[in-house]
Amino acid sequence: MHDMTSATIQVWINQISTELNAPATLSDAIAAADLKPPFAAAVNMQFVPKKNHAHHLLQAGDKIELIVPVTGG
């Protein structure tokens, strides 16, 4: 018997295969990556503004890039 309450999707976060509970948002992926701000986020090479992270639904196979700015000299 298949339990529909534990459905997951597989996405890529910074080139690492990751399973998230479905439905999943970009915010869920960021939480799974345990990344601290500041950073920029893109899904399938498209920048997603921070205000949209909680509403941006992910699909299986999405490629998420979380980019941290480089500082220093």
Each predicted region: which residue ranges?
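Ubiquitin-like/PB1-type beta-grasp interaction modules and other compact soluble beta-rich domains
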Residues: 1-72
